[in-house]
Amino acid sequence: MTTETLTTLEQHDRFLGRHIGPDSEQRQEMLNYVGAESLEDLTTQIVPESIRLNRDLAVGDNVSEAEGLAYIRQIADKNKVFKSYIGMGYYGTEVPSVIQRNVLENPGWYTAYTPYQPEIAQGRLEAILNFQQLSMDLTGLDLASSSLLDEATAAAEAMALAKRVSKAKKANIFFVADDVFPQTLDVIKTRAECFGMEVVVGPAEEAVNYELFGALFQYTNRYGQITDFTELFTALHEKKAIISVAADIMSLVMLKSPGSMGADVVFGNSQRFGVPMGFGGPHAAFFVSRDAHKRSLPGRIIGVSQDTRGNRALRMAMQTREQHIRREKANSNICTAQVLLANMASFYAVFHGPQGLKVIAERIHRLTDILAAGLTAKGVELVNNTWFDTLSIKGLDAKAVQKRADAAGINLRVDSCSESDGSSDQVLGVSLAETTTRTDVTQLFDVILGEGHGLDVAALDAQVMADSTSVPAELVRQDAILTHPTFNRYHSETEMMRYIKRLENKDLALNHSMISLGSCTMKLNAATEMMPITWPEFGNMHPFCPQDQAQGYAQLLGELSEWLVDITGYDAVSLQPNSGAQGEYAGLLAIKQYHESRGDAHRNICLIPSSAHGTNPASAQLAGMKIVVTACDKAGNIDMEDLKAKAAEVADNLSCIMVTYPSTHGVYEETIGEICEVIHQHGGQVYLDGANMNAQVGLTSPGFIGADVSHLNLHKTFAIPHGGGGPGMGPIGVKKHLAPFLSGHSVVKHGLESDGNGAVSAAPYGSAGILPITWMYIKLLGKQGLRESTQVALLNANYMMKKLSEHYPVLYTGRNDRVAHECIIDLRPLKEASGVTEMDIAKRLNDYGFHAPTMSFPVAGTLMIEPTESESKVELDRFIEAMVSIRAEAARVESGEWPVDNNPLHNAPHTLADIMDPEFDSRPYSREVAVFPTAAVKQNKFWPTVNRIDDVYGDRNLFCACVPISDYE
């Protein structure tokens, strides 16, 4: 019989032991190896005393997984899920169960990283390529990106693209039709102000009256009207304008494509293709342009290339456009986008196929026709005379209708519409969706007209079938869509399940092995944390629903904000930015507006260390700032003398510094407090990039250090999964003086001083639908668990660093020869001695069953390794064994035993086709060395499905659509 107390026994179900990889015995063994008595001793050795946080976090104690689920269930139950007819870019949809279970709830899909290592990412690359093909087919344009953050930010990117490529070089006006969604206009205005562009809003037909570089139109517009823009677009092209169209993805199944009308860019939200509304996100925006503008396209693009065997292989194409290479000259600061949601949308299209999508679109349209016929029969006046799914109604007693709608559990849209005489009239909007039924239409008649209307859906159906003019004949799509075999094969659940599984098997994710990407924090995304995001109480909430219906979300967002304020040491938090890059942008906007409020609009210079991530200069450029780069010293720290000199030199115009902490070199810089003081002395603000927050939580904080603003990557430090390239969340924390300058929103207001500020995202709380993950993470770990997680992250990194230092030089260390949560190993001496490159080692790790660490950042010719706290000593040792074995292989190249151009590193990764090839016998190493280099690999072999991919071939022969049908024959 046990002698332990009940309290001790109750602790056994706590989450901490599930989240942290090394158990107590493993931890002690690792501590002994690195030369520390305890986690506290190791923390003291690593974290500078001047920034050490000597208090507990105020986030409460940890709870069990069952308790956490019970708590969040109580919160979810406070949300009232009404039937939503609000529309405005967010609609009811049916998530096919085969996709929910096998993609959204599958760690093989949601724990993968952005496919920088394409040889072990062919599955999701194919799914993303399907998304691009879907986007191109529906829009009628040539080249699509893999996804953007949301429809409104896609609009801002379209404006930026138009400015880059328009031949109307002297023009500075971007025209926006006055019937676009208000949240889209909001984000455009925010971006335009930073770029110094003039936004003119007016009726669509007035666009020709301006000297402009670009214009934006909504198809269908916010009131539901469908317009043939062909003649208008022709006239605008004569003025050298670039034309962008915000389009509804479901309507494009039925309607003439914007590309065929002459649009240059088409974008929109793919949410209604099987992704829940989620109180605003996450959702994947599609973005498509003409081929002529390919070098200016924002976001990532998947292209077709070939591997060393000449076989078809997929990869990210034209990466030289992106922030991690082009920095402040990049097309966009977009990094993480919405790949998981793009994959869900693409699988939705694959599952339904063109005929299934047509049935869904025609059903939505038919029900809208029926609703319109019934209303007009009763004398109701419609604002629009054409429509796909949306009706705008005027002349009714809006309050009476709203009262009946509330009683019926229905949300309608209350809008305003400009009249020809300049006045404005209140209108009610109704947008139908895939989830709408004939019973719902009858209920809408009851709500809008009152009971006793006598309308019969079946009779109205017969009427509209015989005579419907809601879509003019010239606007009915005539061309075939989704003709590729992929969209016409997998319509049974069995076939769909197997297709998804076949793609999943090609990818390496956290459910197979550690992904030790430095600066990416690929930690556990626990199943219990993930569960609530699929609950309808969170998933089926419209972001613009009445606030009294979203009390559960209000509580969750409020508690999460309080916790993040405490963890960061700041005074206020904005949850609106829906990626880390957007967080940077929002934080810099707050700094910019703060200076302007003090009459210091001239302060526009941003100091950025040379070691910074590429998003930093890209975001600063986006905020209209000029970048001045500061040097780093030989130890990898910010060169204080250079910083002081440059801060003094630009003091009159200094806006801020962007600094990462711990540094991108993986150390706690001792001078961080002094850096903050120098910037403040010269009138600037300190932006502390939260990318490395996993080494701060519970030990120090940006606010305590002296920073003014930071973004937090919730998809790194706070357990939201990476999803193969998104979703992410990048909320920002600020000191009190910056709080009035946080992002506002034109649709949802909260009575705050920041309400009048521009938005950076389409939804007021960004991708609110995934915030329950972070809420659960903090709730389950509690104050002690969060701190201990950070400490174990330090332990794992230092254990790995010391083990690897016996075989590879470690580039940078901090006090007491320690690193923070990541370390950089220098491969340049090895390359010089043997000819083995960092690329060779990265690809060889695939043969050992590992994703490569971050390659050549922040220093070329290096690998940056971040194991996180979630990895056990067993997994760390397995990775270390692989790296040691690879070093031994490189030694055989160095000695001349293996040729530089014919060895297991140069030829990596190896596929089944390699070892089945009779010509393999001519290689100077065995098949076993190629694919089973250690005993551990035999126990858990991952097979890359393609050989090393030819990047140059892919960019020289750019092809970014599904491969031709002949490849399938």
Curated annotation (Swiss-Prot):
Q: Does the keyword Oxidoreductase apply?
A: yes
One GO BP annotation is: glycine decarboxylation via glycine cleavage system
Q: Known catalysed reaction(s)?
A: N(6)-[(R)-lipoyl]-L-lysyl-[glycine-cleavage complex H protein] + glycine + H(+) = N(6)-[(R)-S(8)-aminomethyldihydrolipoyl]-L-lysyl-[glycine-cleavage complex H protein] + CO2
Gene Ontology, cellular component aspect:
cytosol; glycine cleavage complex
Instruction: Tell me which InterPro entries the record gives.
Output: GcvP, GDC-P_C, GDC-P_N, GDC_P, PyrdxlP-dep_Trfase, PyrdxlP-dep_Trfase_major, PyrdxlP-dep_Trfase_small
Modified positions (N6-(pyridoxal phosphate)lysine) are K716
Give the EC number(s) listed in the UniProt record.
1.4.4.2
Q: Which HAMAP family match?
A: GcvP (MF_00711)
Of which family is this protein a member? Belongs to the GcvP family.
Query: What is the recorded function of this protein according to its Swiss-Prot or TrEMBL entry?
Result: The glycine cleavage system catalyzes the degradation of glycine. The P protein binds the alpha-amino group of glycine through its pyridoxal phosphate cofactor; CO(2) is released and the remaining methylamine moiety is then transferred to the lipoamide cofactor of the H protein.
According to the record's subunit comment, the protein's assembly and interactions are: The glycine cleavage system is composed of four proteins: P, T, L and H.
Question: Can you say what this protein is called?
Answer: Glycine dehydrogenase (decarboxylating)
